[in-house]
Amino acid sequence: MSLPDQADDAQQPLLSSPPSEDDAGRSVKPTRNVEDTVLPETATLGRTLSWTSAYILVISRIIGSGIFATPGAIVKATGSVGLALLLWVGGAFISGCSLIVGLEYGCMLPRSGGEKVYLEFTYRYPRFFASTLVAVQAVLLGFTASNCIVFGEYVLFGLRIEPSEFTQKALALGLLTAITIVHGCFLKTGIWIQNVLGWVKVGLVMFMGLTGLYVVLFHVRTAEHAAALEKLSWDGLWKDSNWGWGTLSTALFKVSYSYTGMQNLNNVLNEVKNPVRTLKTVAPASLLTACFLYLLVNIAYFAVVPLDEVKESGQLIAALFFEKVFGWNFGRTVLPLAIAISAAGNVMVVTFTLVRITSARIFSD
């Protein structure tokens, strides 16, 4: 041992404790190496998202206003009930393939940021190019202003208030402002509210599906009801099917849009308890739940509403369903408020996650 080393040892106190692992971790300065992204991080406020909150964060992002509007357009394009249902299953399969990639990256890189982290890790040069693209997309294209407008429109329609452009935008701005304040100042309260809205949304879709099954099994038989049930037989399922590739691809795009949001949890993994284990179970459970509910609601639509009316309904198939089951007055009130709740829940979870993506981009520099 050299004399300088001996002098350094002599200056150390005899009763000093050895440095702990925590002290060692705090003494390590963060580097700009991309390999550091494989290390898990914990958010400043801790890991506040339980399994249930994580599940709602995903399923509430997936189930939006699409299930109330797109089934009619898909049946009109495909021509038959069976082919339409097949496309809903096919959309779930395609989303599952995409989900596998998200699970692989999420378990390997359990940090908030989602695609920003994954693209930075995969495409390292030019530096910050991938993260800048993700930031631009998140800021300019990723927000959910359209759902805010939908919320304002359907609240006014459901409450039977004469709509105007000012009142619609005022409600939209009020919703967005309230959600921003809640998520910014009251983290746990915001999570609780979006959990409640998410469960209300799931319960509403389940209620619609079970209502359709109840009508099929216990409602008084009429000629219109018999015609609706006939199209659910094996021969009726595939009648007038349109197998054109152009038609199927367009309809499949519409179906795939209804499954958007499967990787929503990947954006907030810093705040999830047991992130890897939670991600492995929440993502597949959300995919199976969405596929099951979509099929159930579609069957309810086809069992209650005549096929010709379904094809001509455009984006109003849910309105026809509620009108057939509950009557015009009740359906006209319940349906718009249901869509408004769906839109509000979607805005809450999108706001919650997009803020994390933006902050991940800012604090990575």
Q: Can you say where each PLM-predicted feature lies in the sequence?
A:
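Selective recognition of specific alpha-helical transmembrane segments in multi-pass small-molecule
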Residues: F93-C97, K201-L213, K280-L307
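Hydrophobic, membrane-embedded alpha-helices of multi-pass small-molecule transporters
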Residues: S53-F68, G236-F292, V304, F330, ...
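Hydrophobic transmembrane alpha-helices that form the core helical bundles
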Residues: G96-G184, A343-I357
